[in-house]
Curated annotation (Swiss-Prot):
The gene is rlmE. Its main location: cytoplasm. The active site is at residue 167. Its EC number is 2.1.1.166. This is Ribosomal RNA large subunit methyltransferase E. Keywords: Cytoplasm, Methyltransferase, rRNA processing, S-adenosyl-L-methionine, Transferase. It is found in: Cytoplasm. GO terms for cellular component: cytoplasm.
Length: 214
Protein backbone atom coordinates (compact mmCIF):
# COMPACT_ATOMS: atom_id res chain seq x y z
CA UNK A 1 0.00 0.00 0.00
CA UNK A 2 2.79 2.42 0.96
CA UNK A 3 4.63 1.65 -2.29
CA UNK A 4 1.50 2.36 -4.37
CA UNK A 5 1.06 5.68 -2.57
CA UNK A 6 4.70 6.54 -3.23
CA UNK A 7 4.30 5.73 -6.94
CA UNK A 8 1.15 7.85 -7.16
CA UNK A 9 2.89 10.78 -5.45
CA UNK A 10 5.85 10.50 -7.85
CA UNK A 11 3.52 10.36 -10.87
CA UNK A 12 1.59 13.40 -9.62
CA UNK A 13 4.81 15.36 -9.08
CA UNK A 14 6.15 14.28 -12.48
CA UNK A 15 3.02 15.26 -14.40
CA UNK A 16 2.88 18.65 -12.69
CA UNK A 17 6.62 19.31 -12.93
CA UNK A 18 7.15 22.58 -14.86
CA UNK A 19 10.37 21.23 -16.40
CA UNK A 20 8.55 18.13 -17.67
CA UNK A 21 5.93 20.37 -19.29
CA UNK A 22 8.62 22.65 -20.74
CA UNK A 23 10.55 19.68 -22.17
CA UNK A 24 7.40 18.42 -23.86
CA UNK A 25 6.66 21.87 -25.25
CA UNK A 26 10.19 22.39 -26.59
CA UNK A 27 10.53 18.87 -27.98
CA UNK A 28 13.18 17.54 -25.59
CA UNK A 29 13.16 13.89 -24.55
CA UNK A 30 13.74 14.51 -20.83
CA UNK A 31 13.61 17.29 -18.25
CA UNK A 32 17.32 16.66 -17.55
CA UNK A 33 18.10 18.95 -20.49
CA UNK A 34 17.46 22.02 -18.32
CA UNK A 35 20.19 21.00 -15.89
CA UNK A 36 22.73 21.05 -18.71
CA UNK A 37 21.21 24.25 -20.14
CA UNK A 38 21.62 26.15 -16.86
CA UNK A 39 25.19 24.96 -16.35
CA UNK A 40 26.08 25.78 -19.96
CA UNK A 41 24.59 29.27 -19.70
CA UNK A 42 26.62 30.09 -16.59
CA UNK A 43 29.86 28.33 -17.56
CA UNK A 44 29.82 28.90 -21.37
CA UNK A 45 30.78 25.29 -22.07
CA UNK A 46 29.38 24.69 -25.55
CA UNK A 47 30.87 26.65 -28.43
CA UNK A 48 30.71 26.39 -32.25
CA UNK A 49 33.27 24.06 -33.79
CA UNK A 50 33.71 21.87 -30.73
CA UNK A 51 33.88 18.09 -30.55
CA UNK A 52 31.58 17.00 -27.73
CA UNK A 53 31.01 13.52 -26.29
CA UNK A 54 27.84 12.68 -24.34
CA UNK A 55 28.44 9.67 -22.06
CA UNK A 56 25.29 7.83 -21.03
CA UNK A 57 23.45 9.72 -23.74
CA UNK A 58 20.13 7.84 -23.75
CA UNK A 59 17.35 9.01 -24.02
CA UNK A 60 19.10 11.91 -25.72
CA UNK A 61 17.98 15.26 -24.29
CA UNK A 62 21.55 16.41 -23.60
CA UNK A 63 22.61 15.50 -27.15
CA UNK A 64 19.54 17.34 -28.45
CA UNK A 65 20.56 20.47 -26.54
CA UNK A 66 24.15 20.30 -27.78
CA UNK A 67 22.90 19.79 -31.32
CA UNK A 68 20.72 22.90 -31.05
CA UNK A 69 23.63 24.93 -29.69
CA UNK A 70 25.91 23.85 -32.54
CA UNK A 71 23.33 24.16 -35.31
CA UNK A 72 24.73 26.10 -38.21
CA UNK A 73 23.26 28.35 -40.86
CA UNK A 74 19.88 28.18 -42.55
CA UNK A 75 21.33 25.49 -44.79
CA UNK A 76 21.21 23.01 -41.91
CA UNK A 77 23.87 20.85 -40.32
CA UNK A 78 25.99 21.74 -37.32
CA UNK A 79 29.27 23.52 -36.68
CA UNK A 80 30.97 20.83 -34.65
CA UNK A 81 30.84 17.11 -33.86
CA UNK A 82 28.58 15.35 -31.37
CA UNK A 83 29.09 11.75 -30.28
CA UNK A 84 26.66 9.98 -27.97
CA UNK A 85 27.66 6.79 -26.15
CA UNK A 86 25.39 4.49 -24.18
CA UNK A 87 24.90 0.79 -23.48
CA UNK A 88 21.17 1.30 -24.09
CA UNK A 89 19.69 2.06 -27.51
CA UNK A 90 18.72 5.62 -28.44
CA UNK A 91 16.37 6.97 -31.07
CA UNK A 92 18.38 8.80 -33.76
CA UNK A 93 19.04 12.53 -33.49
CA UNK A 94 20.04 14.50 -36.57
CA UNK A 95 23.80 15.20 -36.75
CA UNK A 96 24.55 13.11 -33.63
CA UNK A 97 26.85 10.10 -34.04
CA UNK A 98 25.44 7.49 -31.65
CA UNK A 99 27.47 4.44 -30.63
CA UNK A 100 25.75 1.76 -28.57
CA UNK A 101 27.98 -0.24 -26.27
CA UNK A 102 30.47 -0.12 -23.40
CA UNK A 103 33.17 2.46 -24.16
CA UNK A 104 35.72 0.26 -22.39
CA UNK A 105 35.37 -2.33 -25.16
CA UNK A 106 37.69 -2.30 -28.16
CA UNK A 107 34.91 -2.52 -30.74
CA UNK A 108 33.22 0.59 -29.33
CA UNK A 109 36.53 2.47 -29.12
CA UNK A 110 37.22 1.63 -32.75
CA UNK A 111 33.86 3.11 -33.76
CA UNK A 112 34.67 6.19 -31.69
CA UNK A 113 38.02 6.61 -33.42
CA UNK A 114 36.34 6.33 -36.82
CA UNK A 115 34.35 9.44 -35.94
CA UNK A 116 37.19 11.31 -34.23
CA UNK A 117 39.78 10.51 -36.92
CA UNK A 118 42.64 11.34 -34.60
CA UNK A 119 41.05 14.51 -33.22
CA UNK A 120 40.76 15.23 -29.50
CA UNK A 121 37.52 16.10 -27.70
CA UNK A 122 36.77 19.59 -26.34
CA UNK A 123 34.02 18.69 -23.87
CA UNK A 124 32.81 15.47 -22.23
CA UNK A 125 29.38 15.54 -20.57
CA UNK A 126 28.02 12.68 -18.48
CA UNK A 127 24.58 12.21 -16.97
CA UNK A 128 25.46 8.60 -16.12
CA UNK A 129 24.16 7.27 -12.82
CA UNK A 130 24.28 3.80 -11.28
CA UNK A 131 21.24 1.73 -10.40
CA UNK A 132 20.82 2.68 -6.75
CA UNK A 133 20.26 -0.05 -4.16
CA UNK A 134 19.58 2.16 -1.16
CA UNK A 135 22.70 0.83 0.54
CA UNK A 136 24.88 3.93 0.92
CA UNK A 137 28.29 2.26 0.77
CA UNK A 138 27.41 0.13 -2.27
CA UNK A 139 25.80 3.05 -4.11
CA UNK A 140 28.81 5.29 -3.40
CA UNK A 141 31.16 2.63 -4.79
CA UNK A 142 29.10 2.36 -7.99
CA UNK A 143 29.05 6.14 -8.39
CA UNK A 144 32.82 6.37 -7.88
CA UNK A 145 33.34 3.65 -10.51
CA UNK A 146 31.34 5.67 -13.07
CA UNK A 147 33.23 8.87 -12.26
CA UNK A 148 36.54 7.04 -12.61
CA UNK A 149 35.42 5.74 -16.01
CA UNK A 150 34.52 9.26 -17.15
CA UNK A 151 37.85 10.67 -15.96
CA UNK A 152 39.76 7.85 -17.64
CA UNK A 153 37.86 8.56 -20.86
CA UNK A 154 38.88 12.22 -20.75
CA UNK A 155 42.51 11.31 -20.09
CA UNK A 156 42.61 9.30 -23.31
CA UNK A 157 40.35 11.30 -25.60
CA UNK A 158 40.10 14.93 -24.45
CA UNK A 159 42.28 17.94 -25.17
CA UNK A 160 44.36 19.08 -22.18
CA UNK A 161 42.38 22.34 -22.22
CA UNK A 162 39.02 20.53 -22.30
CA UNK A 163 36.30 20.16 -19.68
CA UNK A 164 34.42 17.27 -18.07
CA UNK A 165 30.93 17.61 -16.59
CA UNK A 166 29.57 14.70 -14.54
CA UNK A 167 26.58 13.96 -12.35
CA UNK A 168 27.13 12.58 -8.87
CA UNK A 169 25.32 12.47 -5.53
CA UNK A 170 26.09 14.53 -2.44
CA UNK A 171 26.39 11.79 0.14
CA UNK A 172 28.67 8.89 0.96
CA UNK A 173 31.77 9.02 -1.24
CA UNK A 174 31.11 12.56 -2.53
CA UNK A 175 34.12 14.14 -0.80
CA UNK A 176 36.34 11.48 -2.39
CA UNK A 177 34.98 12.34 -5.84
CA UNK A 178 35.59 16.07 -5.29
CA UNK A 179 39.18 15.39 -4.24
CA UNK A 180 39.63 13.12 -7.26
CA UNK A 181 38.49 15.97 -9.50
CA UNK A 182 40.87 18.40 -7.78
CA UNK A 183 43.71 15.96 -8.40
CA UNK A 184 42.85 15.72 -12.11
CA UNK A 185 41.71 19.25 -13.05
CA UNK A 186 43.08 22.75 -12.55
CA UNK A 187 39.61 24.20 -11.90
CA UNK A 188 36.70 22.39 -10.21
CA UNK A 189 33.19 23.84 -9.94
CA UNK A 190 30.23 22.33 -8.08
CA UNK A 191 26.79 23.03 -9.57
CA UNK A 192 23.24 22.38 -8.30
CA UNK A 193 20.90 23.43 -11.14
CA UNK A 194 17.39 24.67 -10.39
CA UNK A 195 16.02 21.80 -12.50
CA UNK A 196 17.38 19.28 -9.99
CA UNK A 197 14.47 18.17 -7.84
CA UNK A 198 14.48 19.54 -4.29
CA UNK A 199 14.46 16.03 -2.82
CA UNK A 200 17.37 14.90 -5.00
CA UNK A 201 20.94 14.79 -3.69
CA UNK A 202 22.32 15.00 -7.23
CA UNK A 203 25.01 17.56 -7.89
CA UNK A 204 27.16 18.21 -10.93
CA UNK A 205 30.93 18.52 -10.95
CA UNK A 206 32.74 20.44 -13.67
CA UNK A 207 36.45 19.96 -14.16
CA UNK A 208 38.34 22.34 -16.45
CA UNK A 209 41.82 21.77 -17.91
CA UNK A 210 43.63 18.52 -17.16
CA UNK A 211 46.56 18.77 -14.74
CA UNK A 212 48.37 15.70 -16.03
CA UNK A 213 47.24 14.89 -19.58
CA UNK A 214 48.53 11.66 -21.11
Amino acid sequence: MAKNKLNKNWLHDHINDPYVKLAQKEGYRARAVYKLKEIDETEKLIKPGQIIVDLGATPGSWSQYVRNKLSGSVGGGINGTIIGLDMLPMEPIADVHFIQGDFREQEVLEQLEQVLQGRKVDLVISDMAPNLSGIAVADAARMIDLIDLAIDFTQHHMKPSGSLLVKCFNGSGYSYIVEKFRDEFKTVVQKKPKASRDKSSEIFLLGKTLKNPL
